Amino acid sequence: MREKEQEREEQLMEDKKRKKEDKKKKEATQKVTEQKTKVPEVTKPSLSQPTAASPIGSSPSPPVNGGNNAKRVAVPNGQPPSAARYMPREVPPRFRCQQDHKVLLKRGQPPPPSCMLLGGGAGPPPCTAPGANPNNAQVTGALLQSESGTAPDSTLGGAAASNYANSTWGSGASSNNGTSPNPIHIWDKVIVDGSDMEEWPCIASKDTESSSENTTDNNSASNPGSEKSTLPGSTTSNKGKGSQCQSASSGNECNLGVWKSDPKAKSVQSSNSTTENNNGLGNWRNVSGQDRIGPGSGFSNFNPNSNPSAWPALVQEGTSRKGALETDNSNSSAQVSTVGQTSREQQSKMENAGVNFVVSGREQAQIHNTDGPKNGNTNSLNLSSPNPMENKGMPFGMGLGNTSRSTDAPSQSTGDRKTGSVGSWGAARGPSGTDTVSGQSNSGNNGNNGKEREDSWKGASVQKSTGSKNDSWDNNNRSTGGSWNFGPQDSNDNKWGEGNKMTSGVSQGEWKQPTGSDELKIGEWSGPNQPNSSTGAWDNQKGHPLPENQGNAQAPCWGRSSSSTGSEVGGQSTGSNHKAGSSDSHNSGRRSYRPTHPDCQAVLQTLLSRTDLDPRVLSNTGWGQTQIKQDTVWDIEEVPRPEGKSDKGTEGWESAATQTKNSGGWGDAPSQSNQMKSGWGELSASTEWKDPKNTGGWNDYKNNNSSNWGGGRPDEKTPSSWNENPSKDQGWGGGRQPNQGWSSGKNGWGEEVDQTKNSNWESSASKPVSGWGEGGQNEIGTWGNGGNASLASKGGWEDCKRSPAWNETGRQPNSWNKQHQQQQPPQQPPPPQPEASGSWGGPPPPPPGNVRPSNSSWSSGPQPATPKDEEPSGWEEPSPQSISRKMDIDDGTSAWGDPNSYNYKNVNLWDKNSQGGPAPREPNLPTPMTSKSASVWSKSTPPAPDNGTSAWGEPNESSPGWGEMDDTGASTTGWGNTPANAPNAMKPNSKSMQDGWGESDGPVTGARHPSWEEEEDGGVWNTTGSQGSASSHNSASWGQGGKKQMKCSLKGGNNDSWMNPLAKQFSNMGLLSQTEDNPSSKMDLSVGSLSDKKFDVDKRAMNLGDFNDIMRKDRSGFRPPNSKDMGTTDSGPYFEKLTLPFSNQDGCLGDEAPCSPFSPSPSYKLSPSGSTLPNVSLGAIGTGLNPQNFAARQGGSHGLFGNSTAQSRGLHTPVQPLNSSPSLRAQVPPQFISPQVSASMLKQFPNSGLSPGLFNVGPQLSPQQIAMLSQLPQIPQFQLACQLLLQQQQQQQLLQNQRKISQAVRQQQEQQLARMVSALQQQQQQQQRQPGMKHSPSHPVGPKPHLDNMVPNALNVGLPDLQTKGPIPGYGSGFSSGGMDYGMVGGKEAGTESRFKQWTSMMEGLPSVATQEANMHKNGAIVAPGKTRGGSPYNQFDIIPGDTLGGHTGPAGDSWLPAKSPPTNKIGSKSSNASWPPEFQPGVPWKGIQNIDPESDPYVTPGSVLGGTATSPIVDTDHQLLRDNTTGSNSSLNTSLPSPGAWPYSASDNSFTNVHSTSAKFPDYKSTWSPDPIGHNPTHLSNKMWKNHISSRNTTPLPRPPPGLTNPKPSSPWSSTAPRSVRGWGTQDSRLASASTWSDGGSVRPSYWLVLHNLTPQIDGSTLRTICMQHGPLLTFHLNLTQGTALIRYSTKQEAAKAQTALHMCVLGNTTILAEFATDDEVSRFLAQAQPPTPAATPSAPAAGWQSLETGQNQSDPVGPALNLFGGSTGLGQWSSSAGGSSGADLAGASLWGPPNYSSSLWGVPTVEDPHRMGSPAPLLPGDLLGGGSDSI
């Protein structure tokens, strides 16, 4: 009986216990759930909890303090709730991680050791359970079985997830996946309060009781300090392994318990482990652990080393980690001790150790212990995972000597990681290396096992390239990627190979294999990995899809990284990484999986608790969130790593990456690099890539990538490219493309190939990446494709790369890619620009920064950029895109802002890391540049929508010069695609602007682009921009030429390479005769008439470019926000194109740095590039500008003047000879200018027209302007004065380059200069205007001829030398394609005109050149070019004025200004461009145009006349229009719309400007518009103007809508074809032809419909309606405030006319309403596309921008027509949507933009008639841009 009673009692007791346990479980679950709910709170509480919960908890306390870790720790605790806690993906990864972690920890359960292992991420209990469970569930019991390994794996996954998603548990929970329950159970079981001794005796003993083994572990784990000491206790390690688990677990016991079974295994493991640990682990640890630490550094977040501040704990951890054993233990120990951090770190370390194994072992599970290796391997992998870098790196790095790559990937990804890679990585990664080596030793590891590890690793690692580790790894495959490679290679297949697969497999494979025993694990890894596989992992990040995440992570290894770590791993990797680290650790440890649960827990805990983890790391937000599969790509980075060069770009990138590492931005990606690594890395293609770049190409890149892909890895060029591309995701994609090689390439990636398969990539990569993947996929495909060639070439990368295909194709496909590719190749090949490749990869090494995109954005900007436009934003989007942005993605501003800094440094983080890199990258790759752009842009492109951009971009996308460039370029360029850059983001886009711009504008784009790109930077611009200019046309062109070249020369030779040829040519021309270097000289040279012309051209180019920028900017409005994108892009694309060559030097475009702001660099770049830059016509600019640019660039400024000068940040860039350019630039470039100008200023610029830019450029401008002035041969004295000024300004600029001069000062200077110029120009214009003017390069008369011949012709004209010069020739072709620009440039001397004119030409297909005079004047050239189209001398002017770049006009402002002194004042004041007559002030309604009698007005310049009001040709239709245009142009602000200029009514200009700025300018408009004024009569003229200018955007039809707009007929024509046919708008000629149309449309004849533009959202619709009703009953009142337009129909035309008169320029609220007549056609169009379309139409932004611009500007016909002219076709189609949306006018505009021909190609509509047209649209765009842009801006 008694026995029974006892039994009963016992039973009761048991029941009670059970209930108690259940209760606890429930509570824990609830807690977790609650915590989940209250994540924020949970974070800290959780942390506390864990501390309290278990000894470990206490130990972890510090980690808790760590904050991030703490949070994570909490999460692990929260694990049980895994299922519940399964964090919805929607939670931003960053938060998610934190929350989740917190939650887990919060669970209250002490984070079990496994948790610790996970780094806290995973949750202790779940460690096994969750991890194992989930994994098990997936993987199965095996995992569980090998709890340690498994759990870790799963945990890892979980951790990863957790980190990201909180999946940690989730992973386990990830988990929660299906296994949740299990995990929960396990969790339950596992999770025990430290206090829960009863339940968890283990735990209870955990501290004291844990087995001795445990104890040891515990101790070591428990106390971080201890840990350290434990470290020494490698022995502990033995236990450690087992112990590890234990240790890891908070409750060792728990762990043990959980591990229990493990323990034995563990023991075995332990011993092995220990050995391993010591050995491998040690090694790893060293590597990993240490690395961890170091790598942690890499992890950035993880390692204190890396980010001590970020992860204070980490530091500890590192220390803790010291002991290899400890590391092992560390898992557990760490948990305890640093708990999350240490644990994590240690774990990482462990992992590292594992990795070491992995390296070897991993490679095989082999390494010493199977177990160990497995474990270790796992660890290793894990490491990878957690430290993908590490892991990967290790493996990679290790494996590879890539290390670098590896490192890159991981390293890059994670600083720590890299370090982690440590040896390899480290080696590769410098820092990493350091870390690695030192890092390895870094932390205790180093000391401890570090040595071993170090040795082991180090050798290899360090060797990095070598095999050592490699070997070991290699065994894995040294392939370079080696490690990864191997992995990827298949190698191992599995191993990473598999994993690599996507990397996914990456770990997977690796894991798989390695796990060997760990089959499960493997499975787990595999499974999860696989699925998650990288993807998963990525997913993880992305979705942190499963615990697998871990696997994933692993796979992704970074997959995980990807996932959680993903990003962390990846660039951000830190978090992720760390997470990954954690995970990794887990994985690793887990892998060891012996002690699964504990391990998991420990790992989780560790992970979670890791203080060292930066939450950002965990978060997937920036990057991570994106989950771009960048990781994967990043992997590639690895390879590059080795390449030192990579570093270069990479550097930037790397840095970025590294830096980014945390960053998120690309870094992240890079971090991912790990991942990438895997994928890439692996591939790394290194090989392939390698070849190209380093193998690194990819690898390099990879590394870079890691860094940023493009990172370029360093530059990798490809990476660059891709990086760039990747830079944003897209970039990636793109990058990929380039990769293509990757992908396809190798297969280029080889593995990637797999991917390359696209799939692989895609899959792996892509997938998330999508951008990549997607893009990638696409990209890949694209890459491949785009890569197109890439693919094609498998080497693709290389090949492709090499091939222009890339360029081309890439471009095409991916612009970026293509571009990249091309560029890259070129770049690559040319080292000059290797950079090119380098651009991406190459020279950019630094450039990679260039790549900015790549890097940053691109990478982030990277965006990835996959060309994909896909991501649209890519750059930007993603950040910015990543971007950029995203990381610090500068919006580009930075990048350019800092020209000097440029160095790639900046900015964009993108470049930051690579900033330079990217840019250079771009430059390097010119194509790539483009590509980049494209890619990025492309990617961006999606973003493309940037406002008009999109339209542009898109259409551009294709071929049209614009398009193409645009597209790609744009996308690349930014415009098109994007979006712009950023980032995109990278970038980045996005970049659309860039793209579009770039593209479109070739020149503009170029200019802008690069600028945009930041030219770089970012790549985004770079991309496009870089590509930009020419690119614009051809993206490649831009991208290519520009970027690449620029970079090299710019950056590299700065002046030399590119400079030399240019200089030579200039010298020949006399322009540059004195000194390339010397801006002064240059300027002086320019003094000569030739010079003048050239300058003019320069100016023009600049202007154009600038304008473009502006235009783009404005136009896009979109970009503006992103300075980087916008500014850069804007400027860049055009400029880039234009200046690509310069870009090269500057890298502005190419480089991004100096150039970035202005495309000019790119232009030059382009030129070298040769013809891809059709737009390089800008080349003309380049030509004109080039000299200056040379000087400027040499000066350090950005290339072309425009770019450079205006903005060139660093360079004082005399380039700005043309005022207008600066103006233009000011408008757009400001962003580019950013270095010199603040973003806000930039924003103003658009409004101001050129002033800010001008001023910004200030000294730059001055010199440029001066040069321009000096160009005015008719004013010798003036020339002398100008020379003096130039000298002064050069000096000033030097200062300014340093950004020392305040904007205000600069502005003042510029204003003064502008005024001088204005006056002089006015005189000149008048003189020239008369016949002279005509003679001015009107010749480029044939729009196309102009364009086509432009190079030769235009060049001949003023720039024969230029022409001769390579770049120009490049331009030539570019020009040809760009046609317009070149012509503009060339004709107008291509200089001033070039930008504007080019743009205009481009848009309109007219030769801008004609307006040399205009050029001379202000932007006269700019104006002229536009007009040139018409063919009449004034045509140029028309163009200029029309300038369709109205905005350009701004820059052209000079020309414009003078013409409209008064108007200028109004707007001008704002712009404060001296060039512009004061009367034209941006904010003020312009009164001037209307009153100005061109004949009598002293201020009138051809440009200002627009139609040549003052000019005798006024009679000329063109002239008249021109004069109006000019006036409008004067608005310059309205850069976006040349049409204002084109339109007689200055309002137009004003509208632009104002529209931008808002109506201030419009009033003038109004008058101007009076129906008759230029209206009908000039209709013809107008027409012409419009045609030319159409872009001019008659924003203020006012009295009379732009010709045609009002007229239904014209409308039709415009809309339909007339314009089209004429293409007036649509076609460049069209304008002329349009004349009749115009006349029709022109007829201002009032219609029943009135379109009100420039409305702001603040306007009260009812009030507006009431006001409108005062003039008559409204039959229709359609208000679209989003577009800033209102479409009103009166019952009679009289009422409509009355209302128009009353409403036009009416100030309502905070805006000035522009009222224009709209034809039924336009209206229908407007209505049809109005709202929806607008947004839809290119970008909604653009739409908005356009629309609003258009609307605003086009409000009435004027706008419309202008638009029509402009974008007419496009407009409508594209713009149309945007514009269309606007209103009838808009419609017209729409049509302008959209469908209508015109830009058709450019714009969208293809009216493609003229690709050159592209230019036209550009000009148009600018006008519109201005308006819209301003708005946007």
UniProtKB/Swiss-Prot annotation:
One Pfam family here: TNRC6-PABC_bdg
Single GO molecular function: RNA binding
GO BP terms: miRNA-mediated gene silencing by inhibition of translation; miRNA-mediated post-transcriptional gene silencing; positive regulation of nuclear-transcribed mRNA catabolic process, deadenylation-dependent decay; positive regulation of nuclear-transcribed mRNA poly(A) tail shortening; regulatory ncRNA-mediated gene silencing
Protein name: Trinucleotide repeat-containing gene 6B protein
GO CC field: cytosol; nucleoplasm; P-body
RRM domain sequence ranges: 1648-1720
Annotated PANTHER family: TRINUCLEOTIDE REPEAT-CONTAINING GENE 6 (PTHR13020), TRINUCLEOTIDE REPEAT-CONTAINING GENE 6B PROTEIN (PTHR13020:SF32)
Modified residues (Phosphothreonine): 1449, 1464
Chain spans, region PABPC1-interacting motif-2 (PAM2): 1472-1490
Domain of life per record: Eukaryota
Major location (coarse): cytoplasm
Disease: Global developmental delay with speech and behavioral abnormalities: An autosomal dominant disorder manifesting in infancy or early childhood. It is characterized by mildly delayed fine and motor skills, mildly impaired intellectual development, speech and language delay, and variable behavioral abnormalities, mostly autism and attention deficit-hyperactivity disorder. Additional non-specific features include facial dysmorphism, myopia or strabismus, and skeletal defects.
Keywords, in A-Z order: Autism spectrum disorder, Coiled coil, Cytoplasm, Disease variant, Intellectual disability, Phosphoprotein, RNA-binding, RNA-mediated gene silencing, Translation regulation
Region feature Disordered, mapped onto this chain: 1-98, 126-164, 205-350, 367-1046, 1193-1212, 1316-1346, 1590-1638, 1730-1763, 1809-1833
Compositional bias ranges of the Gly residues kind: 772-787
The species this protein was found in: Homo sapiens (Human)
Polar residues bias locations: 143-153, 224-253, 267-289, 327-345, 401-414, 462-491, 527-538, 574-586, 618-630, 737-746, 756-767, 809-820, 900-916, 927-941, 969-993, 1202-1212, 1627-1638, 1748-1757
Ranges of biased composition (kind: Low complexity): 52-70, 211-223, 298-309, 379-388, 438-449, 1025-1038, 1321-1330, 1815-1824
Compartments, as annotated in UniProt: Cytoplasm, P-body
Regions of compositional bias (Basic and acidic residues) in chain numbering: 1-16, 24-41, 87-98, 638-651
Residues where Phosphoserine is found: 879, 1432, 1461, 1816, 1832
Family: Belongs to the GW182 family.
Stretches assigned to coiled coil: 1-39
Classification via SUPFAM superfamilies: RNA-binding domain, RBD
